């Protein structure tokens, strides 16, 4: 997993060094917010998402390709599992991702994305408590639309598989989010 994260960071750094400065929509620094839902398939629960997003987009010279690196933090504290007195909540969820997009028009950009996702699961049963951080890789697709020179709207779907060394198996999540961002 550490090798995958290192490779993703190295690829992003090399892509940024090859990219030209900000030109057109979807480039430059951006901050925004997302609302959506995440379905935890192993727990059978759907949890509401409220995400803060920071990103940096850059254009590739002579093409309509746009790369975007982003960081997301989920403010939710949702219950992802509840059965027979056992309750598990997901909290402190964050992701670091890279999206490769293509401007099909000057104002519309579909993209594919890969992310590192990490969340803290807190379990309680009666008077017993425990927590474990799970992490993994998410893949997704989305689209953004520039409604003004500095404002963009977007929608994104992501599937992630999360695990850790103490957990046998994978937790699977499916997220659908819509959001707005301001670019600088």
Language model segments and positions:
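Gram-negative bacterial Sec-dependent N-terminal signal peptides
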Residues: 1-19
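Gram-negative outer-membrane beta-barrel domains
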Residues: 17-184
């Amino acid at each position: 997993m550490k090798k995958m994260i290192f490779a993703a960071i190295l690829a992003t750094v090399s892509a940024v060094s090859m990219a030209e400065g900000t030109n057109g929509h979807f480039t430059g620094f951006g901050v925004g917010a997302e609302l959506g839902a995440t379905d935890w398939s192993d727990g059978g629960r759907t949890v509401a998402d409220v995400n803060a997003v920071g990103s940096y987009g850059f254009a590739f010279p002579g093409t309509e390709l746009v790369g975007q690196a982003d960081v997301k933090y989920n403010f939710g504290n949702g219950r992802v599992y509840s059965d027979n007195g056992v309750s598990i909540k997901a909290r402190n969820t964050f992701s670091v991702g890279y999206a490769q997009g293509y401007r099909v028009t000057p104002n519309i950009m579909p993209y594919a994305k890969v992310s590192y996702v990490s969340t803290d699961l807190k379990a309680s049963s009666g008077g017993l408590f425990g927590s474990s951080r799970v992490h993994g890789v998410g893949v997704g697709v989305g689209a953004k639309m520039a409604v003004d020179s500095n404002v963009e709207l977007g929608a994104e779907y992501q599937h992630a598989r999360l695990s850790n060394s103490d957990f046998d198996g994978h937790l699977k999540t499916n997220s659908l989010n819509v959001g707005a961002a301001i670019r600088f």
